């Protein structure tokens, strides 16, 4: 491969300590310092959480600029890069950033005269910015840098892959504190060896796991939270394969899965499922024909859901709409609701695809309980018991009453019942009414012929008779009270 000339910028960074006098950390986990220069992430060893934090770490950052012609072009390109320092404590689950410091890479590598004192590689002190979990004064970072721009020979392939890969070098320990420059001869040997060239281009350093992520197993909630972190933190935690998370509402999910939907059919088998339900279907038809209060209920087209086992199931939501839909009359609606409350669930197969399909349909529960002969007999027996209890209670009250007053009340009750029945039915003509005469309280006889001749209906005659009767009762009661007082 042909060799081309390029400029290589190397930065030797020596981190000494982080000081913050008078500050105590509430958490006791270890702390490390993360550095990002030239897009390369490196970190120091962990130290105890007690200020001052003494690191004494040395690391080297290198980057090749194949398009640069002179060092001025390299310095100009360094203006678009940022050097970032992060002081991170290993607080579960993903660590907590205590303070940060960022500066333009050009100013960081080549500081001005006001930032250094004495030699170029002397110590520097910068104030970091507090973020969270740190109270008091801001911490101060002590470090020193050595920057070198050299000319090197690289292959054209490396020039094309410079933007895709990053060249890393392990921290080199030098006894005299000087940066060891690689010669072109050593680079030529490395380029010839395929094994060494494979290790020259390593994976990106930010793809390597952090110390905190190695020591803790993230939970599902932590994974979702880590997806919302900054871009730099997401790069450091890329080995976890968190992936993009899209939070959806629960309403977007369907209530149940419909396996197969058949077109509606007018046949009765589609309404009631398999032919094994013929008895239940006949009972349902009898209910519609025998009970007039359910006349407004009509059968509708239902969607049939086919299970993997071949059995048809009715859509439960269609059945609910059929029973709970508003009706023209109020009585059927009340009866339907009453039947829904007192219905008992029937047995269904347990191999349905959805738990909703395991429930018995409202129609099955409706007519399976009310059309069976034992239930009908039980209902009739209960009604008879209630009627007998009311008759016994009425008979007991009649025994306590006066026989004469009871005869009068019975006569008036019969007149009231017949007259109300005639008046409530406008189609009931006078020719259809039974012929007969009625005796009033004063011995007068009132018949249908007398009503037609005098032009008075039974209602006003009944009201007049009731007035007379209550007036006589009142007079008798007053006379009995006065007679009792005189006797005393």
Swiss-Prot record:
It is found in: Secreted; Cell projection, Cilium, Flagellum. Disulfide bonds: none annotated. The keyword Signal applies. Residues 1-17 form the signal peptide. GO terms for molecular function: myosin light chain binding. The modification Phosphoserine is found at residues 217, 219, 265, 274, 325, 343, 346, 354, 424, 465, 487. GO terms for cellular component: extracellular region; motile cilium; sperm head-tail coupling apparatus. Residues 200-220 have a biased composition (Polar residues). InterPro entries: SPATA6_fam, SPATA6_N. There is a cross-link at residue 248 (Glycyl lysine isopeptide (Lys-Gly) (interchain with G-Cter in SUMO2)). Residues 175-225 are annotated as: Disordered. Testis-specific, in spermatocytes. Keywords: Cell projection, Cilium, Developmental protein, Differentiation, Flagellum, Isopeptide bond, Phosphoprotein, Secreted, Signal, Spermatogenesis, Ubl conjugation. One of its GO terms (biological process) is cell differentiation. Pfam families: SPATA6. Required for formation of the sperm connecting piece during spermiogenesis. Sperm connecting piece is essential for linking the developing flagellum to the head during late spermiogenesis. May be involved in myosin-based microfilament transport through interaction with myosin subunits. Interacts with MYL6. Belongs to the SPATA6 family. This is Spermatogenesis-associated protein 6.
């Amino acid at each position: 491969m042909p060799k081309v000339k390029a400029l290589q910028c190397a930065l030797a960074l020596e981190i000494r300590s982080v000081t913050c006098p008078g500050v105590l950390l509430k958490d006791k986990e270890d702390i490390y310092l993360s550095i990002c220069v030239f897009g390369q992430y490196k970190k120091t060893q962990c130290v105890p959480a007690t200020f001052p934090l003494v690191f004494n770490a040395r690391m080297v950052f290198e980057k090749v600029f194949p398009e640069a012609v002179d060092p001025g072009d390299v310095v100009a390109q360094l203006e678009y890069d940022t050097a970032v320092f992060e002081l991170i404590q290993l607080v579960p689950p993903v660590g907590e950033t205590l303070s940060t410091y960022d500066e333009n890479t050009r100013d960081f590598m080549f500081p001005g005269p006001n930032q250094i004192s004495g030699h170029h590689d002397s110590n520097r002190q910068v104030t970091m910015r507090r973020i969270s979990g740190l109270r008091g004064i801001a911490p101060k970072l002590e470090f020193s840098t050595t920057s070198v721009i050299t000319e090197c020979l690289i292959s054209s392939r490396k020039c094309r892959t410079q933007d895709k890969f990053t060249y890393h070098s392990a921290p080199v320990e030098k006894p005299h504190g000087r940066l060891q420059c690689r010669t072109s001869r050593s680079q030529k040997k490395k380029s010839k060896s395929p094994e060494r060239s494979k290790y020259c281009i390593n994976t990106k350093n930010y793809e390597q796991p952090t110390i905190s992520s190695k020591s803790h197993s993230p939970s599902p909630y932590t994974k979702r939270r880590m997806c919302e972190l900054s871009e730099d933190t997401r790069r450091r935690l890329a080995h976890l394969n968190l992936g993009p998370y899209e939070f959806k509402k629960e309403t977007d999910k369907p209530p149940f899965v419909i396996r197969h939907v058949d077109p509606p059919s007018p046949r009765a088998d589609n309404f009631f499922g398999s032919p094994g339900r013929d008895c239940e279907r006949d009972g349902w038809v009898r209910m519609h024909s025998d009970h007039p209060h359910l006349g407004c209920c009509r059968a509708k087209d239902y969607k049939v859901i086919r299970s993997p086992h071949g059995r048809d199931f009715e859509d439960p939501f269609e059945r609910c709409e059929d029973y709970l839909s508003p009706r023209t009359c109020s009585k059927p609606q009340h009866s339907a609701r009453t039947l829904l409350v007192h219905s008992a669930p029937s047995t269904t197969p347990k191999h349905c695809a959805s738990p909703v399909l395991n429930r018995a349909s409202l129609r099955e529960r409706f007519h399976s309980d009310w059309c069976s002969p034992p239930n009908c007999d039980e209902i009739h027996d209960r009604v008879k018991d209630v009627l007998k209890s009311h008759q016994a209670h009425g008979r007991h009250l009649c025994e306590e009453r006066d026989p004469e007053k009871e005869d009068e009340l019975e006569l008036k009750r019969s007149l009231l019942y017949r007259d109300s029945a005639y008046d409530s039915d406008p189609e009931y003509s006078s020719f259809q009414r039974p012929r007969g005469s009625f005796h009033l309280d004063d011995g007068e006889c009132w018949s249908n012929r007398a009503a037609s001749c005098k032009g008075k209906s039974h209602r006003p005659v009944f009201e007049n008779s009731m007035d007379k009767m209550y007036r006589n009762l009142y007079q008798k009661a007053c006379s009995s009270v006065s007679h009792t007082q005189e006797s005393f």
